[in-house]
Amino acid sequence: MHCLVILGFLLGSLVAFSWAGVTTQPPPLIRTLSAGGDIGPQFDVGKTKEPEDAEFWHNVGLRQLEKTIKQAQRVKEDSYQKKARNIIIFIGDGMGISTISAGRIYKGQYLKHGYGEEETLVFDDFPNTGMAKTYNVDKQVPDSAGTATAIFSGSKTHYGAIGMDATRSKKNGQQGRVQSVMEWAQKEGKRTGVVTTTRITHATPAATYAHIYDRDWECDTEVPAESVGFHVDIARQLVENAPGNRFNVILGGGMSPMGILNASEVKTTIFEGPTETICTRGDNRNLPAEWLAHHANDTVPPALVHNRKDLLNVNVKKVDHLMGLFRNNHITYSIAREAGEPSLQEMTETALGILERGDESNGFVLLVEGGRIDQGHHMNYARAALHELYEFDLAIQAAVNNTDPDETLILVTADHSHAVTFNGYALRGADILGTANSHEKNDPMFYETISYANGPGYWDHLANDSRPQNSSNMWMPLKHFTAEERAAPTYRHLATVPRKDETHGGEDVAVFAYGPGSSLIRGVFEQNYLAYVMSYAGCLGPAKDFDDSCEDHKDGQKDRPLDKPNPKRNGATVVGASLIPILTAATAAILRGRGL
């Protein structure tokens, strides 16, 4: 008998060892020839992988939500059940960790608050933080269209896609559509709005209302012949279709895609790069006029404004629908803003005045984008980019000051990072935009604390057209540039690889959260999870019925005890039994009946 037991034990151990040996092996490596001729290892992926469409990412989002809630329940924490009447999501476009750190110092030095390093940004004090993985379905390093779709709709997608999942088609404008948090909010009777310093048709704001194959199709003239009749340009979608034509607030740049060019627009400072180009309409339509006509029968007439003075004169206690378009293209960088252009803070305060009215009971959802942080980095304009972050911080402070912390969930994050570095061994209090090693007198080459992996700054700093033997002679000494030149917003910091447009960075981005539901932000998660945080905390969209907390909140009941069974989640696992995210019966039911 003992021999049989020992034999069974040995056989069982052998099977277990063999199984473990198989399942713990890393994916097989294959070697491929890259376009540049270099051979590098890549993982063999995609052969048995399920399609990463909206249903796939819906599953991922709900699993992360369940995992996070279980973690809270294990430590008897119930703050995750608190519900938000209002939601504000701040997107610092391109605001990676290096930008946040450098921007914090820039703020302190700009305001002359000590050395700079000890300064704080408003969102530094938010109680909950996490890290979001930003990759697109088809790219390790993402773009703003795919990331914004993930944030607002809960589905990761292809690079360049807006409001559509990975099944999108150039010849089918309905295929792969996903709803955004703005659509979810409007179904619950909430007010909605979008504020940005970019064109209102640019990638991030467009992802709140548009569904289109390519982010560049902002005007009718940009839609290729093969897609005409299937896809409608982004600007038209804003005024023709919900949720865009039901927004209470639309503030930003982009008059040209909307069909109302200002021929006398002033440009005091000339910025360069692809971001400064803009499309024009070919159908001669005046879309703001059509927007006004759409709201002509409103109880209170809509307001259309084009300058700072008119914006600040809007009666926010009466106006229900406001559109403000302030430039043909993007609103000018804040460091060189033209007369008559509002600040992001002013636009945010005006938006909140309209959205958060005392006589309204359903609340609101608002996007505020600091969009030109990204565009400054693309041109290696470090000073312009960091000043945009400072303005972004002021807008966040305005939101904190003008909302109820017990009713408003505020999320601050980036859609992606940038290839910008904060390097060297600069002395404490050294100018963040200055040199890192000027105190080292024997160093043969001074270099700046902020530099870029790639971008147009390469050509500005290159000593000559050939690569010399001594790499230290490859770059022009910084003394070649005058102090005035280096202080200009158009000064480009050095980039080590030549590109007309600096690239994004692929590292995780930080998420800062404040208010009811903010405790759902913890750890590292896929970026699309943010949509599920807003859905669950705001009682809207696909996670509204994830458990009974929204019904309890609606009925004015006390939070459900942690050990109370949830009838909507039949078959749910015992609380705290496992931190491994699994799909419960209720979650599966939501997947079947509430697809994005």
From Swiss-Prot:
Keywords: Cell membrane, Disulfide bond, Glycoprotein, GPI-anchor, Hydrolase, Lipoprotein, Magnesium, Membrane, Metal-binding, Phosphoprotein, Signal, Transmembrane, Transmembrane helix, Zinc
EC supergroup of this enzyme: hydrolase
Transmembrane spans: 571-591
Disulfide bonds: C539-C550
Residues linked to a glycan: N262, N297, N401, N464, N470
Membrane protein topology class: Lipid-anchor; GPI-anchor
Sequence positions that bind Mg(2+): D93, H202, T204, E369
GO molecular function terms attached to this record: alkaline phosphatase activity; metal ion binding
Catalytic residues identified in the record: S144
GPI-anchor amidated asparagine: lipidated positions: N570
CDD domains per UniProt: ALP
Reactions the enzyme catalyzes: a phosphate monoester + H2O = an alcohol + phosphate
GO cellular component, one term: extracellular region
Main location: membrane
Matches recorded under InterPro entries: Alkaline_phosphatase (IPR001952), Alkaline_phosphatase_AS (IPR018299), Alkaline_phosphatase_core_sf (IPR017850)
Tissues where the protein occurs: Ellipsoid body ring neurons in the adult brain and in the lower Malpighian tubule and ureter.
Compositionally biased tracts (Basic and acidic residues): 548-566
GO BP field: epithelial fluid transport; nervous system development; sexual reproduction
Listed SMART domains: alkPPc
Family in the record: Belongs to the alkaline phosphatase family.
Protein name per UniProt: Alkaline phosphatase 4
Phylogenetic classification of the source organism: Eukaryota, Metazoa, Ecdysozoa, Arthropoda, Hexapoda
